Amino acid sequence: EEDLKKGLKEVGLAEGRVFNKSLLDRVEQELRQQYFGRGYYAVSIQPTVTPLERNRVDININIEEGASAKIKQINIVGAKEFSEKDLLSQFELTTPGWITWYTKNDQYSRQKLSADLEKLKSFYMNRGFLEFAVDSTQVSISPDKRDVYITINLNEGARYQVSSVKLAGDFTISEEELAKLVVVKPGDVFSREKLNESNK
């Protein structure tokens, strides 16, 4: 509640300020989006404005969060080289299981989904798929706003191998010694992780 009051004050809704109805409407929409982003699709936000004496108003924002929506299904479309099970094992988000009552990883969050998509990209980039891309993600909610269905459409692209490794620059130690430190070798499947190790 204190964080909410602080946020309202920052946007101009605070005691002593001139009341602006359009600003209150914008705050309501932003609050709704914040709750949606955390998986609370059943949230109810009811602002009420009560006129007081001496041209003042009393603003009350009643929020009922409701239950957070649970992930019912995650589908990955376009994967050919890896199984959906292997790809979903990279994700923090998951469907309800015996431990999710504790981890809450079955509760949809826009931020968590973005982080999981980054993990998916790293998974592919470390296995030679330089052109990997997530073409689209669809998040749909059941009519009762309790279940979330996620569909991820991806394009794996081609798998690349390292054809050659060349060292360039002025070296204080021999090129042979430096070559021993290079993790990436010709013929290896390209890996962004290995390339970063070699750069250290």
What is each model feature region?
Residues E1-K200:
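Interaction-mediating elements
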